[in-house]
Amino acid sequence: MAAKIRRQDEVIVLAGKDQGKRGKVSQVLTTGKLIVEGINLVKKHQKPNPQLGVAGGIVEQEAPIQASNVAIFNSATGKADRVGFRFEDGKKVRFFKSNSELVK
């Protein structure tokens, strides 16, 4: 089955502490989760590792967010949207359900 949300898609958060925020998908995990730039930031306590040249301290990084808590953002309508699939010229393409435009 093809993925409705893919890397580099702009998404909007529907539920959780970051509700209403938008960001680009940087990674899609096989567990049904996504990593979105600037969303679901957590503080991680990093131990120093002199062999790798990593300094210790508290690092802020993106944690995975459940795919059901985000929706793809339609820039034409300015709202969250649903995605459908159809065949055009023998290729399977994604389109927005609200206005039938292709997802870029």
Swiss-Prot record:
<dbReference type="InterPro" id="IPR003256">
    <property type="entry name" value="Ribosomal_uL24"/>
</dbReference>
<keyword id="KW-0694">RNA-binding</keyword>
<keyword id="KW-0689">Ribosomal protein</keyword>
<dbReference type="InterPro" id="IPR005824">
    <property type="entry name" value="KOW"/>
</dbReference>
<keyword id="KW-0699">rRNA-binding</keyword>
<keyword id="KW-0687">Ribonucleoprotein</keyword>
<dbReference type="GO" id="GO:0005840">
    <property type="term" value="C:ribosome"/>
</dbReference>
<dbReference type="InterPro" id="IPR014722">
    <property type="entry name" value="Rib_uL2_dom2"/>
</dbReference>
<dbReference type="InterPro" id="IPR041988">
    <property type="entry name" value="Ribosomal_uL24_KOW"/>
</dbReference>
<dbReference type="GO" id="GO:0003735">
    <property type="term" value="F:structural constituent of ribosome"/>
</dbReference>
<dbReference type="InterPro" id="IPR008991">
    <property type="entry name" value="Translation_prot_SH3-like_sf"/>
</dbReference>
<dbReference type="Pfam" id="PF00467">
    <property type="entry name" value="KOW"/>
</dbReference>
<dbReference type="GO" id="GO:1990904">
    <property type="term" value="C:ribonucleoprotein complex"/>
</dbReference>
<comment type="function">
    <text>One of two assembly initiator proteins, it binds directly to the 5'-end of the 23S rRNA, where it nucleates assembly of the 50S subunit.</text>
</comment>
<protein>
    <recommendedName>
        <fullName>Large ribosomal subunit protein uL24</fullName>
    </recommendedName>
</protein>
<comment type="subunit">
    <text>Part of the 50S ribosomal subunit.</text>
</comment>
<comment type="similarity">
    <text>Belongs to the universal ribosomal protein uL24 family.</text>
</comment>
<dbReference type="GO" id="GO:0019843">
    <property type="term" value="F:rRNA binding"/>
</dbReference>
<dbReference type="GO" id="GO:0006412">
    <property type="term" value="P:translation"/>
</dbReference>
<dbReference type="Pfam" id="PF17136">
    <property type="entry name" value="ribosomal_L24"/>
</dbReference>
<comment type="function">
    <text>One of the proteins that surrounds the polypeptide exit tunnel on the outside of the subunit.</text>
</comment>
